[in-house]
């Protein structure tokens, strides 16, 4: 009992209880639904995977997904394509925030131009989805969900990677900043990237397996 004018001090410990929430995807049926209840198989590439694998661009992060392969088909111009389930790049629909803003040419030359710092997550759906996403979604759909400005912040990073253990290096500098109003009704996210990759000639025949990238 506690009498008037007296204080009582008690010490107690709270046991940790981790609550895991279901992941939410929007690529399965064009509306937000839990990943567990999605009608099709959707793999999610989050920011943690980009950081763990030291992936600075979208194309590098996609290489770590099952059934997905990003390959360079031209060592002179840097032509790339995403293969899902073995089908060529034109059979894959690429979306940004669930909108098909990628043209056929951008889907070829834009994969290495999307910095990982602007990506919140990437939803990869393997299998046909032409009725939902258009005629290009035969092999699958890649939906890039970008970050939203939630608070004023900024980040500057630089990575340097040795290509094939040789004297060829990949230098990448990225900058992103988030600006929001005082009432949090409007916001702006700014992304910037400067990348220079030296050409890599594996067998010394005068033709680069990886083209120079600026």
Annotate each predicted stretch with a short phrase.
Residues 81-83, 99-126, 147:
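Short acidic/polar hinge/loop motifs at secondary-structure boundaries
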Residues 2-6, 38, 67-78, 134-138:
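Short, glycine-/polar-rich solvent-exposed loops and beta-turns at beta-strand/coil boundaries
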Residues 60, 83, 143, 174-178, ...:
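Outer-membrane beta-barrel architecture
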Residues 31-33, 89, 101, 161-163, ...:
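Structural signature of outer-membrane beta-barrel domains
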